[in-house]
Amino acid sequence: MQAWVIGNWKQNPATSHDVNALLDDLCAAISTTKQMSHDNSARCQIMVAPSFIHLAAVNGRLKDTSILCAAQDVSGHSASVGAYTGDCSAQQIVDAGATWTILGHSERRQYHQESNDTLLQKMIHALSQDLGVVFCIGESQAQYDTKQTLEVIDNQLAVIKEFITQQPELIKALPTRLIIAYEPVWAIGTGKVPTVAEVSATHKHIKQILAGFADSLSNMTVLYGGSVNADNANSFAADPMIDGALVGGASLKADSFLTIATAFSQASI
């Protein structure tokens, strides 16, 4: 299975100048990596998710590279146009050059009170426009401490089950247009990291739940996110249940981001 390493830039960098500087560093690092291994991009797909305001410019810079471009969210109100101040629709995001979007990140769930119903509408809008979905799930510190991780994940994955019920004509797109990112909320940006064994067991559970939804979902890509960095990437990449990483802070430094991508690329040999 091809690995995926996705950089979620969140509300960074601050200026267009800084965005271009990061892209310069990233493209230079990618070029060096390809010189070391021509098959690198085939083994590990790299993708970055900039802010909406930088989406078109980043896509323009990356269109002749193997790096894909994703949005960080889509409107839950309309897939195309409408009187929804501040929203960006899936159609607009595709027009800007993105081929994927992140949905359900814990920061969106926390700061914008995104519910399963909201995320279902966003998923429908995205996939109806052939915009792939990186669907984020994960438990809080309190839920982890009280051993509710699997219960929480099952509840969050219910969005996908309901999507299949409501949109049977789109089921065929899911194996190639849906990625799950398991991100324990307590590990995001904190430096706290679950053990590889814990992540592996959780990923196995996620894959089993998805396979139970539909036969076509028996081999889904599941990424890990939460304080992934250049120092621990090899450990996560070595586990066959972990198909890649959703990277936050480390994706804002080209060298560390490419070190993570190289770890998963080499593990896919």
Swiss-Prot record:
One of its GO terms (molecular function) is triose-phosphate isomerase activity. It catalyses: D-glyceraldehyde 3-phosphate = dihydroxyacetone phosphate. GO terms for cellular component: cytosol. It comes from the Bacteria. It is an enzyme of class 5 (isomerase). One of its GO terms (biological process) is glyceraldehyde-3-phosphate biosynthetic process. Substrate binds at N8, W9, K10, G189, S227, G248, G249. It is found in: Cytoplasm. InterPro entries: Aldolase_TIM, TIM_sf, TrioseP_Isoase_bac/euk, Triosephosphate_isomerase, Triosephosphate_isomerase_AS. Its EC number is 5.3.1.1. The active site is at H105, E183. Pfam families: TIM (PF00121). Keywords: Cytoplasm, Gluconeogenesis, Glycolysis, Isomerase. Disulfide bonds: none annotated. Involved in the gluconeogenesis. Catalyzes stereospecifically the conversion of dihydroxyacetone phosphate (DHAP) to D-glyceraldehyde-3-phosphate (G3P). Belongs to the triosephosphate isomerase family. This is Triosephosphate isomerase. It comes from Psychrobacter cryohalolentis (strain ATCC BAA-1226 / DSM 17306 / VKM B-2378 / K5).
